[in-house]
């Protein structure tokens, strides 16, 4: 509901700087404005040369360019939304794994606490793995510094945590405190976590083909550099401002597509709120543990 309210104020959204691509594209917009100004000055100083072009081709080219930019933005959004769905799966599977472990696992309080804490560790480790960092303060709080150091030293941290979860379940089966059918059900939930992080890694390590960006940006450059020649006879000295007016949405849409392509990078404006998501998972599974402990005491 808080996010819903945040998008209701038209004026605050229209003039927002934080979270906007405007600071990123404004230098480029200004550059095209300067180029247009130089073209207008050259036209004014050199009257014997005809620098003018017809407007009609730019109307067609503008429509084509707009379509390409929308497709580019949609491609970026599809990647962003797929990443969000995968993290939604991690949220749900973490809850399911905690519920299944507490329901079918041993009644030993130490085992249950250890198992749930390893579950709470997984999303933090997955987030850090996707962001290429091995600083694990949340894991230190959950499992202690020694375990956090072991996880940080692992080649693939999410797989290490998933392995420890599987070992914890296997120990319960070996001790006769968990039957095989229950183990298979709970381990199925655990395996799903690896499937989801694998999907996230596929997105993170497979950028859109660079040739796609090169062609679109080359088209943008040619369109905006030559646009002033079509405007000179129409708007005169206002040509630089009209060029900038056209350049802003064009370059902004291009940048939006770039920002949405990397949903896990904190350097991108459109990155997923993984800190909040992982904290939510930790809180949810630890709450389940507390509820279970209170029920055991009754």
Where are these regions (language model features)?
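N-terminal juxtamembrane/topogenic regions of multi-pass membrane proteins
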Residues: 1-92, 107, 233-237, 264-268, ...
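Transmembrane alpha-helical segments and their cytosolic interface motifs
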Residues: 23-32, 201-233
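Intracellular alpha-helical coupling/juxtamembrane segments of multi-pass membrane proteins
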Residues: 80-97, 186-197, 203, 267, ...
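Alpha-helical membrane-embedding segments
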Residues: 87-99, 112-130, 274-289, 296-298
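Structured inter-helical modules in multipass membrane proteins
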Residues: 98-212
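Long amphipathic all-alpha helical oligomerization modules
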Residues: 212, 227-231, 238, 257, ...
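A hydrophobic, small-residue-rich beta->alpha segment in the mid-to-C-terminal subdomain
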Residues: 247-250, 256-275
């Amino acid at each position: 509901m808080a996010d819903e309210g945040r998008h209701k104020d038209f004026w605050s959204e229209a003039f927002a700087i934080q979270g906007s691509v405007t600071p990123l594209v404004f230098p480029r917009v200004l550059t095209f404005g300067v180029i247009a100004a130089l073209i207008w000055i050259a036209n004014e100083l050199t009257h014997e040369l005809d620098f003018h072009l017809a407007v009609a081709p730019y109307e067609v080219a503008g429509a084509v360019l707009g379509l390409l930019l929308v497709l580019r933005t949609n491609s970026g959004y599809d990647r962003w939304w797929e990443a969000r769905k995968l993290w939604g799966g991690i949220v749900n599977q973490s809850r399911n794994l905690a519920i299944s472990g507490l329901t079918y696992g041993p009644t030993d309080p130490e085992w249950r606490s250890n198992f749930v804490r390893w579950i709470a560790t997984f999303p933090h480790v997955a987030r850090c793995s996707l962001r290429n960092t091995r600083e694990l303060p949340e894991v230190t709080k959950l499992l202690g510094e020694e375990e956090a150091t072991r996880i940080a030293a692992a080649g693939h941290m999410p797989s290490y945590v998933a392995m420890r979860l599987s070992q914890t379940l296997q120990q319960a089966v070996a001790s006769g405190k968990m039957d095989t059918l229950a183990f298979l059900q709970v381990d199925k939930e655990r395996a799903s976590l690896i499937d989801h992080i694998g999907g996230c890694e596929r997105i993170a390590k497979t950028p859109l083909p660079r040739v796609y960006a090169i062609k679109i940006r080359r088209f943008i450059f040619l369109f905006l550099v030559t646009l002033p020649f079509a405007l000179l006879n129409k708007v005169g000295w206002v040509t630089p401002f009209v060029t900038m007016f056209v350049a802003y949405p064009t370059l902004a849409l291009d940048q939006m597509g770039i920002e949405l392509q990397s949903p896990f990078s904190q350097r991108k404006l459109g990155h997923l709120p993984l800190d909040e998501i992982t904290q939510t998972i930790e809180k949810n599974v630890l709450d389940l543990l507390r509820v279970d402990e209170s029920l055991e005491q009754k």
